[in-house]
Design a protein with these regions (language model features):
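Rossmann-like NAD(P)-binding element
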Residues: 51-79
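NAD(P)+-binding Rossmann beta1-loop-alpha1 motif at the extreme N-terminus of oxidoreductases
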Residues: 1-49, 58-61
C-alpha cells in the first residue's frame, strides 16, 4: 500500500517513520529544508532532534505529488 502523511512536524514525522516500516511512505512538508533533511539525512532535527527516521521514508514539498502517490492519506497537521 502507498501511504502519504501530510505534515512535517512532530506528529506527521513520527507517524510517517513508523508507517515506512511496512509501506511505501511519502511525507509532505511545507518547508523545503525539512524535506531535504528527511530525504538526505533521515532526520527532522527541527521537530525530533536526536531521532533517526526510517531509511525508506521519502519526503516532498509538492502537495499534489503526495496526494497522487497515496492509496491512503494520513493527516498529521494542526487543526
Amino acid at each position: 500500500m502507498k501511504v502519504s502523511v501530510l505534515g512535517g512536524g512532530n506528529w506527521g514525522t513520527t507517524v510517517a517513520s513508523l508507517v515506512a516500516r511496512r509501506h511505501d511512505t511519502l511525507q509532505w512538508a511545507r518547508n523545503p529544508e525539512v524535506v531535504r533533511e528527511i530525504n538526505e539525512d533521515h532526520r527532522n532535527t527541527a521537530y525530533l532532534p536526536g531521532f533517526a527516521l526510517h531509511r525508506h521514508l521519502r519526503a516532498t514539498a509538492d502537495f499534489e505529488e503526495a496526494v497522487r502517490h497515496a492509496d491512503l492519506l494520513i493527516l498529521g497537521v494542526p487543526t
